[in-house]
Amino acid sequence: MQNLYIKTYGCQMNEYDSERMADTLAVSHGLRLVDDPVLADVLLLNTCSIREKAEDKVFTQLGFWRPFKERRPEVVIGVGGCVASQEGERLRRRAPYVDLVFGPQTLHRLPDLLDACLAERRPQVDIAFPMLEKFDHLPQRPGRDGATAFVTIQEGCDKFCTFCVVPHTRGREYSRSMPDILREVRALVEQGVREITLLGQNVNAYRGATGLVGEGGLADLLERLARIPGLLRLRYTTSHPANLDDELIAAHGSIGILAPHLHLPVQSGSDRILRRMHRKHTVGQYLDKVDRLRAARPGIQISSDFIVGFPGETDADFAATMELIDAVRFDQSFSFKYSQRPNTPALKLKDSVPEAVKEDRLAVLQGRINGLAQGYAQALVGTQQAVLITGPSRRDAQELTGKTACNRAVNLAGSMDWVGQMLDVEITAALPNSLRGRAALVAPTSQRLAV
């Protein structure tokens, strides 16, 4: 048994979890990550249950893998993540060729589950919620060759929005200890990482491992991270408006390396719908926090998530959402049609919105958001932006790509020696999904990627 293949669905936290699965099995079993599932001895599917038909997507993928198992019975197939947590034994009954089923909070038990599967010759299922165990058993991350990295600092959510499965699949809010986070980030920076994105389902609810008053929240953590030599940029996602406190707003003005971009999901511009969603904030409270963010950090860009067609959403409710979009002028937001998710309170709500109406509203909303985003991109043409070069462009391996502070992708000509540097880049063109630029100044050697 030598090769491991992992396919990941969903958010950045799942990407982080997949990295840790690979790290864990590399240490415990010497498994090497490969890009081709045909070569794998162990295939893992890390799943997401946020959107409609998530379960169907999982079983379709497992169907693609089933022939590997039929040709080589010794191949191990595992399913992790939120669909695994949600389905448990039902997943095994529908796909009996699956050997491992594990939840987001038990990925650290993968070595034991794999050993038991091989020794006992029978499937293993573990979808418990031992939050403390997961953070206490994260392996040391091996050397990296990239300029950016994700670091999970918080998991779960206590907000219980009526449309959301997260509390049922990831559990209640739990924060990682600050010393552990600082150690991991220092190690990553020593390996050459220059930008860190802190992750959590409700990341600004971070309160340290004990949750005691005075231990330090997200603002305190950001201040400590900003002192690490060599770290050039910080981000965090995803935030809940109810937990965006005064200290965190002030941090956007005082911490220079904190990116002037915040993803702050609002979901709807109607107070009536926000109440039905159990969002724990009003439109007015949201606007007040946006105003204070922009006062603390002029030029900060705000992106959001929107759900259209939530049960009971009227034309007036949708119009209120469009008014909010115009008022805030969101940048690069995500929007979705409401879909029923298992075990959520919204399943009991009546007054469902017809599918055709959902589609029409989504098209209108996305058109407005895309127009605002393109207008902002066009306004960057002719300006100089600090761009962290992250590697070769996916479209053209002879070019480089990087990110602006406001999270815009920029492609430019240059040398691979620039990877890991923060460059001043003149923006020369705005394309639908990216910017083009020209390097104006190469950063000093001290800012280059360690190799």
Curated annotation (Swiss-Prot):
Q: What is its EC number?
A: 2.8.4.3
Primary location class: cytoplasm
Which residue ranges does the record assign to the TRAM domain? 378-441
Claim: Iron is one of the keywords in the record: yes
Q: Which UniProt keywords apply?
A: 4Fe-4S, Cytoplasm, Iron, Iron-sulfur, Metal-binding, S-adenosyl-L-methionine, Transferase, tRNA processing
Q: Which GO terms describe its cellular component?
A: cytosol
**Occurrences of domain MTTase N-terminal (ranges):** 2-119
GO molecular function: any one?
N6-isopentenyladenosine methylthiotransferase activity
Q: What class of enzyme is it?
A: transferase
Q: Where is the Radical SAM core domain?
A: 143-377
Write down how the cofactor binds this protein.
Answer: Binds 2 [4Fe-4S] clusters. One cluster is coordinated with 3 cysteines and an exchangeable S-adenosyl-L-methionine.
Reactions catalysed, semicolon-separated, are: N(6)-dimethylallyladenosine(37) in tRNA + (sulfur carrier)-SH + AH2 + 2 S-adenosyl-L-methionine = 2-methylsulfanyl-N(6)-dimethylallyladenosine(37) in tRNA + (sulfur carrier)-H + 5'-deoxyadenosine + L-methionine + A + S-adenosyl-L-homocysteine + 2 H(+)
Query: Where is it localised?
Result: Cytoplasm
UniProt: [4Fe-4S] cluster 2 binding residues: C157, C161, C164
The cofactors required by this protein are:
[4Fe-4S] cluster
Q: How does it assemble?
A: Monomer.
Q: Which family does it belong to?
A: Belongs to the methylthiotransferase family. MiaB subfamily.
Report the function annotation for this chain: Catalyzes the methylthiolation of N6-(dimethylallyl)adenosine (i(6)A), leading to the formation of 2-methylthio-N6-(dimethylallyl)adenosine (ms(2)i(6)A) at position 37 in tRNAs that read codons beginning with uridine.
The protein in question is named tRNA-2-methylthio-N(6)-dimethylallyladenosine synthase
Q: Which gene encodes it?
A: miaB
